[in-house]
C-alpha cells in the first residue's frame, strides 16, 4: 500500500521532516516515490514552517494512497491557512 508520511531528517534535537509518498513496506527514512512537501517543527522567525503540494497529494490520494495521521493534520492546517 502507498502511504504519504513524514521522513525524518535534520540533526539531533533539531528535527526536519520531508513529506514523502512511499510504499508502506519501506523503512521510514528509506526509499520513497516522490517528495510532496516539508515540515519544520522548530522553525523560528521568518523561516517557513510548512510547505505542502496539495495538488500532488490529491493526485496520490485519488490513486489510493493513505495519509498518515500527522500528515492528514498538516494538510488540513495548510488548506485552512491557504
UniProtKB/Swiss-Prot annotation:
One of its GO terms (molecular function) is structural constituent of ribosome. Gene3D superfamilies: 3.30.1320.10. GO terms for cellular component: cytoplasm; small ribosomal subunit. It comes from the Bacteria. SUPFAM superfamilies: Ribosomal protein S16 (SSF54565). GO terms for biological process: translation. Keywords: Ribonucleoprotein, Ribosomal protein. Pfam families: Ribosomal_S16 (PF00886). InterPro entries: Ribosomal_bS16, Ribosomal_bS16_dom_sf. Signal peptide: none annotated. Belongs to the bacterial ribosomal protein bS16 family. PANTHER family: 30S RIBOSOMAL PROTEIN S16, SMALL RIBOSOMAL SUBUNIT PROTEIN BS16M. This is Small ribosomal subunit protein bS16. It comes from Idiomarina loihiensis (strain ATCC BAA-735 / DSM 15497 / L2-TR). The gene is rpsP.
